[in-house]
Amino acid sequence: MTTVYIADTGVFVRCGGPDKDKFQQLRRALRQAGVSLRIPQRVYEELGGDPAADEYPSGNIPYPDGFEEGWIVVADELDYANPLVSTVMDEARRFIANETDRDEDSIEKADPALVGLAAQVLDTGEADHVVLLTTDKPAGKAAETLLPKHGFSDRIEFRYVSVEYLETLTATEFR
């Protein structure tokens, strides 16, 4: 079974910078497990990267080592022409708006992109299972609620990345 791990901006913000223990704990766990965190291009932009760059890292990204070492990877552009991806992203935006009692237009673009990326990697067969690591509970709930409605039952897992999660993280979380 192939598992893809998708992370949001909040994971890196919650870690602090590269000199912080939580960041190093995440780095160590991923490297020991031999896996990477995939981030949508929208998340890369939120982290300060230049989306027009030909290679990563770029811009003022505060986590260049993660990209250079290969444990943070920027995902390919979302395929908005794929009806599943665009539908799931629209549904995710509505779901998050309802969960947070906000207008759809005020939802950060990176949140639906997380769910869209999960749908895309499952739909293309790139992964059999997706683990979404996020500090955004509504986005995680959107993924766990919506993707099964599109034929991906038992193929998405939401992990809330709390401070405690990061402090106790080991490679076994990624195996």
Question: Where would I find each of the regions flagged by the language model?
Answer:
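Short, flexible loop segments at boundaries between secondary-structure elements
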Residues: 155-175
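Active-site-proximal, substrate-binding regions of enzyme catalytic domains
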Residues: 2-128, 139-146, 150-151, 164-168
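Short beta-strand scaffold positions
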Residues: 133-134
